[in-house]
A protein has these predicted regions:
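Non-catalytic structural scaffold of enzyme domains
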Residues: 1-266
Length: 266
């Protein structure tokens, strides 16, 4: 039986989902969050759909064993690859992430938006469906951005090599006249200051973190699973990679010291 005081489970290929964790912590602070970073296999963007599906099911099974009341997939690639399988297999709520095409279409004034996306998302049926539903009246420039996640997984948010990559990915979008850029990975939210600097003040950056936090709050409320107001949510972190290194990176990205446990089975 699910109880309102149970934690919310989250997972991602690595640390990108922490950007969503921050939004959840801000929007619904009473909720406890158990987070799994599959850092040993990051990034998922170059993995097969079968791998992402199976890995999502494995991690969700672990989180179920920890007594979670809901699952948040803190990854665009993870959502594309495993959300359907998780919703079919689990009885608890599953909240996924999709690129913020709809709000970007609403925000653009030039009628041209850009989307920085992982390679796996760029060609996905899910993105194509979003473009069909919301992007028919605007021009959408899809820009796959391989190589960024590795920098973020190392807590490198402004190094010279990273800056060159970001400039190379963003410049064609600016030349095409975009005034709105979708951050199509939870990882890329940590690069918001750098991307904003490269894109300039006239370009709006949009991500899905706040919307995911709102959706989670809505789903928990509908199921009468919301943590009691006034309670203080806690956090636990696991990684399939090196716990010491993950603790360093997660602490740097969250701006506070955390401890990380080794995910059983890796």
């Amino acid at each position: 039986m699910l109880v309102s005081g149970a934690p919310v489970g989250m997972f991602d290929s690595g640390v990108g989902g922490l950007s969503v964790l921050r939004e959840i912590r801000s929007a619904i602070p009473p909720e406890s969050i158990y987070y799994v970073a599959d850092s040993a296999n990051a990034p998922w963007g170059d993995k097969s759909p079968d791998f992402v599906r199976d890995r999502g099911l494995e991690i969700a099974t672990f989180l179920l064993g920890q007594g979670v009341k809901a699952i948040v997939i803190g990854s665009n690639t993870g959502t594309a690859g495993s959300a359907a399988a998780l919703r079919s297999a689990l009885t608890i709520p599953v909240v996924g992430i999709e690129p913020a095409i709809k709000p970007a279409v609403a925000a653009t004034k030039s009628g041209v938006i850009g989307a920085l996306v992982p390679v796996a998302v760029g060609g996905s049926d899910r993105l194509a469906s979003l473009l069909d539903r919301f992007g028919s009246d605007v021009k959408v420039m899809i820009q796959p951005v391989p190589g960024l996640v590795e920098h973020i997984e190392a807590a490198d948010l402004d190094g010279p090599e990273l800056r060159r990559k970001v400039e190379g990915y963003v410049r064609p979008l600016l030349e095409a006249g975009v005034d709105t850029i979708v951050l199509g990975s939870t990882h890329y939210v940590f690069l918001r200051p750098l991307i904003s600097e490269v894109a300039g003040p006239r370009v709006t950056l949009i991500d899905t973190g706040p919307a995911v936090a709102r959706q989670l709050a809505k789903v928990l409320g509908e199921r009468e699973l919301s943590a009691a107001n006034g309670s203080s949510g806690t956090e636990r972190f696991w990684t399939s990679g090196d716990p010491e290194n993950s603790a360093r990176v997660i602490s740097a990205l969250l701006g506070r010291k955390v401890s990380v446990e080794k995910l059983p089975g890796g």
